[in-house]
């Protein structure tokens, strides 16, 4: 009963919040449609993140000047500073969603909030170079500004706590992408809303089988051995 589920999107493309569209710089997230595999019925909150926030923090976490600020001003450990480089653009956006959600629900040290870090900054080194060219050389004062404005300064704007009617409205948007354009059966669409046991619960019941397939894939590719 105490569990809340939030989903994020780019403020520049507020499909969930406003049935909107547009371009944005939060790479690695879907936009302009509601994914078939999004269980909208159990979603409690929709949160929009300004893509400028994630861009600024990407530079804060991944430049020498930004890391100097984190170490000397915020007294973060070298280990934590290193871990912040694991966050890519969409991962940073997810963390910002957590901050906004925590502020909205007035969470405290007695609460737990979690998210998924879907990418790494290693994928975006060229983007960091572009930001340096666009905004000029980074410095500690700018790092301080970015931290205070684009992280500490986040507010509870551009989010929505979803009612049952809100959720159904968002779910119904799937029709235009998946039934009209992708020839899915409308019965299957309705099942995603009305037949939780036969759809979402059935997927969760396959966890052990999916883990086995993941292990087989990792073994075949040698991915884990290379880490």
Model regions and ranges:
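Active-site/ligand-binding loops adjacent to catalytic centers
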Residues: 2-86, 127-227
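Glycine-rich phosphate/adenylate-binding loop
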Residues: 60-103, 109-122
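Short, well-ordered loop/turn elements at secondary-structure boundaries
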Residues: 42, 108-109
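Secondary-structure boundary elements
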Residues: 1-4, 104-108
């Amino acid at each position: 009963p105490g569990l809340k589920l939030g989903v994020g999107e780019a403020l520049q493309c507020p499909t969930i919040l406003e049935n909107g569209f547009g371009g944005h710089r939060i790479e690695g997230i879907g936009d302009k449609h509601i994914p078939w595999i999004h269980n909208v019925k159990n979603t409690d909150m929709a949160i929009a993140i300004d893509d400028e926030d994630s861009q600024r923090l990407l530079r804060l976490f991944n430049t020498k000047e930004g890391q100097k600020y984190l170490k000397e001003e915020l007294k973060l450990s070298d280990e934590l500073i290193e871990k912040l480089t694991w966050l890519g653009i969409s991962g940073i956006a997810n963390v910002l969603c957590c901050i906004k959600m925590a502020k909205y629900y007035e969470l405290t040290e007695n609460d737990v909030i979690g998210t998924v870090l879907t990418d790494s900054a290693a994928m975006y080194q060229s983007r960091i170079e572009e930001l340096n060219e666009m905004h000029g050389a980074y410095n500690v004062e700018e790092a301080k500004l970015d931290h205070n404005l684009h992280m500490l300064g986040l507010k509870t704007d551009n989010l929505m706590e979803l009612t049952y009617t809100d959720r159904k409205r968002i779910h119904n948007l799937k029709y235009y992408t998946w039934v009209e354009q992708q020839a899915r059966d409308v019965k299957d669409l309705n099942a995603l809303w009305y037949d939780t046991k036969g759809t979402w619960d059935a997927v969760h019941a396959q966890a052990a089988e999916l883990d086995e397939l993941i292990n087989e894939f990792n073994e075949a590719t040698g991915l884990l051995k290379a880490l």
